[in-house]
Swiss-Prot record:
A molecular function GO annotation: calcium ion binding
Domain FIP-RBD intervals: 574-636
Binding partners and assembly: Homodimer. Forms a complex with Rab11 (RAB11A or RAB11B) and ARF6. Interacts with RAB11A; the interaction is direct. Forms a heterooligomeric complex with RAB11FIP2, RAB11FIP3 and RAB11FIP5. Interacts with ECPAS. (Microbial infection) Interacts with human cytomegalovirus/HHV-5 protein gM/UL100.
GO cellular component, one term: centrosome
GO BP annotations listed: endocytic recycling; neural retina development; positive regulation of G1 to G0 transition; regulation of cytokinesis
Natural source organism: Homo sapiens (Human)
Annotated InterPro entries: EF-hand-dom_pair, EF_hand_dom, FIP-RBD_C_sf, Rab-bd_FIP-RBD, Rab11-interacting_regulator
Domain remarks in the Swiss-Prot or TrEMBL record: The RBD-FIP domain mediates the interaction with Rab11 (RAB11A or RAB11B).
The EF-hand domain, residue ranges: 49-84
Gene: RAB11FIP4
The keyword Metal-binding appears for this protein: yes
Keyword Membrane: yes
Stated name of the protein: Rab11 family-interacting protein 4
């Protein structure tokens, strides 16, 4: 048990080293994905070492040049630099996979151990099941003359004790459960039983052998006796000595059997891996098959060589105590065949071989028990590692789930905010669309009204144009008439001027005649002459005033004609511009469905300005008509 305790301490130290390496791996700054970058390791290495050492370190940690290092490669590289890479196989497999490497094989071994119905063992030795010392299977293996291949039976019988290990390792409470309690941590209390049970049982078996030799014979197969699996082996030497005593009592040539040697192994050299577990399980399965074959091929109720030898020894002791040796030989000669000596020699050899095989099997069973104990400790350590890994994985899973929940909540909040913004934007666009539709409807109604007003204005403008045309014709006729009147007036004026000139000359002639006639009476004629002179002067002034007024009248008429021509030309030019703008308004009415809001507003303002100018133009025309010829605007029925 000291070796097992030492062995269990080594993986614990190894696990502590792995946990420290985990802390170093975390401190080196691993990424969130669980990998450590080679550049990071190289940078840290250059702070504490040289270039060649850093390159060697990187080569150990990243032999495949992947550019990143996981924890398994990190541990393997560190242990490879230390020269103990093999010690890390099981630990890394548990660290990385989180499962027991040999877990699938152990239940099979347990079930097989529970099915074996052969002889039972306690600490490497056989426990008697009946008053007889040897079980029926060993007695069948040691039969003097078996008819079915004695060499095969002799070869299988030593391995029979090894096969029975599956059924022997267990507590009394584990008879129905096989080896299940041995590999489970909750059954540790059942592994170790008091050593007094096995010691008392061994002492009782030895005592019954010595005191009741005359009653020792084979009675076949009996009930199995449960034995403690992990108790010490105090009766190994006793049973070995019993075998030796039996051999020496049959023949004096049989020497003392050597004592069983106990080997203490170093716990660090007993590391058992999964491959060895598989080998041991395969070996146990093979031994179980061979045991079943041996039972099937062995004859029933045959007297074994050991029983026969013990009968001879009992007869010899009994005859020597009574002093009747001759009667004993006489009875032996009568009861036995002539070849009894050869059979006794053959039995001596077989007993010696069986003793040696028993010692070998005892050593093998001790080693297997020790390895089994180591495997149990190993399983317990691996279970603890699995629990640690499960706890770590659960914590990591909870942390990851919490991060994902936080990220999901953040995304949900962002999504809700974005949806609210989009809904507000959609609502705003819907309001703008509704407003634009209302504006378009209003603009359409205004455009229709403007079209109607434009149509009315066009009709009025057409009527006014017709009237203006009539007025222009009338104006032309009036101008022609005015010219004719001017010509007639000029002719009349010239005629009047000539008439005035003739009258002046006639007046002068009459004045001269009058003067001549009045010369005889000068007193009276002086006053009349002065009156005539004044009348003549006044007439001349009036004539000059008439001429001046006529000239001013001519000038005013010319100016009036010029102004009327200018007004007419300006009115015609403005009318042309307004008609062109009206044509543009008609094209705008066709484009109102495809135009934008700003364009519609600008076109509407321009149309209103054109309408205002048209109103002013019509007002001017009406005022001009009222000034010149109001009769045109009269309504004629």
């Amino acid at each position: 048990m000291a070796g097992g305790a030492g062995w269990s301490g080594a993986p614990a130290a190894l696990l502590r080293s792995v946990r420290r390496l985990r802390e170093v791996f975390e401190v080196c700054g691993r990424d969130p994905d669980g990998f450590l970058r080679v550049e990071r390791v190289a940078a840290l290495g250059l702070r504490f070492g040289q270039g060649e050492e850093v390159e060697k370190l990187v080569k150990y940690l990243d032999p495949n040049d992947l550019g990143r290092i996981n924890f398994k490669d990190f541990c393997r590289g560190v242990f490879a630099m230390k020269g103990c890479e093999e010690l890390l196989k099981d630990v890394l497999s548990v660290e990385s996979a989180g499962t027991l490497p040999c877990a699938p094989e152990i239940p099979d071994c347990v079930e097989q151990g529970s099915e074996v119905t052969g002889p039972t063992f306690a600490d490497g030795e056989l426990i008697p099941r009946e008053p007889g010392f040897f079980p029926e299977d060993e007695e069948e293996a040691m039969t003097l003359a078996p008819p079915e291949g004695p060499q095969e039976l002799y070869t299988d019988s030593p391995m029979e004790s090894t096969q029975s290990l599956e059924g022997s390792v267990g507590s009394p409470a584990e008879k129905d459960g096989g080896l299940g309690g041995l590999f489970l941590p909750e059954d540790k209390s059942l592994v170790h039983t008091p050593s007094m049970t096995t010691s008392d049982l061994s002492t009782h078996s030895t005592t019954s052998l010595i005191s009741n030799e005359e009653q020792f014979e084979d009675y076949g197969e009996g009930d199995d006796v449960d034995c403690a699996p992990s108790s010490p082996c105090p009766d190994d030497e006793t049973r070995t000595n019993v075998y030796s005593d039996l051999g020496s009592s049959v023949s004096s040539s049989a020497g003392q059997t050597p004592r069983k040697m106990r080997h203490v192994y170093n716990s660090e050299l007993l590391d058992v891996y999964c491959s060895q577990c598989c080998k041991k399980i395969n070996l146990l399965n093979d031994l179980e098959a061979r045991l079943k074959n041996l039972k099937a091929n062995s004859p029933n109720r045959k007297i074994s060589s050991t029983a026969f030898g013990r009968q001879l020894m009992h007869s010899s002791n009994f005859s020597s105590s009574n002093g009747s040796t001759e009667d004993l030989f006489r009875d032996s000669i009568d009861s036995c065949d002539n070849d009894i000596t050869e059979k006794v020699s053959f039995l001596e050899k077989k007993v010696t071989e069986l003793e040696n095989d028993s010692l070998t099997n005892g050593d093998l069973k001790s080693k297997l028990k020790q390895e089994n104990t180591q495997l149990v400790h190993r399983v317990h350590e691996l279970e603890e590692m699995v629990k640690d890994q499960e706890t770590t994985a659960e914590q990591a899973l909870e942390e990851e789930a919490r991060r994902h929940r936080e990220a999901y909540g953040k995304l949900e909040r962002e999504k809700a905010t974005e949806v609210e913004l989009l809904n507000a934007r959609v609502q705003q666009l819907e309001e703008e669309n509704t407003e634009l539709r209302t504006t378009v409807t209003r603009l359409k109604s205004q455009t229709e009204k403007l079209d109607e007003e434009r149509q009315r204005m066009s009709d009025r403008l057409e009527d006014t144009s017709l009237r203006l045309k009539d007025e222009m014709d009338l104006y032309k006729r009036m101008m022609d008439k005015l010219r004719q009147n001017r010509l007639e007036f000029q002719k009349e004026r010239e005629a009047t001027q000539e008439l005035i000139e003739d009258l002046r000359k006639e007046l002068e002639h009459l004045q001269m005649y009058k003067l001549d006639c009045e010369r005889p009476g000068r007193g009276r004629s002086a006053s009349s002459g002065l009156g005539e002179f004044n009348a003549r002067a006044r007439e001349v002034e009036l004539e000059h005033e008439v001429k001046r007024l006529k000239q001013e009248n001519y000038k005013l008429r010319d100016q009036n004609d010029d102004l009327n021509g200018q007004i007419l030309s300006l009115s015609l030019y403005e009318a042309k511009n307004l008609f062109a703008a009206q044509t543009k308004a008609q094209s705008l009415a066709a484009e109102i469905d495809t135009a934008s809001r700003d364009e519609l507003m600008e076109a509407l303002k321009e149309q209103e300005e054109i309408n205002f100018r048209l109103r002013q133009y019509m007002d001017k025309i009406i005022l001009a008509i009222l000034d010149h010829n109001p009769s045109i605007l009269e309504i004629k029925h």
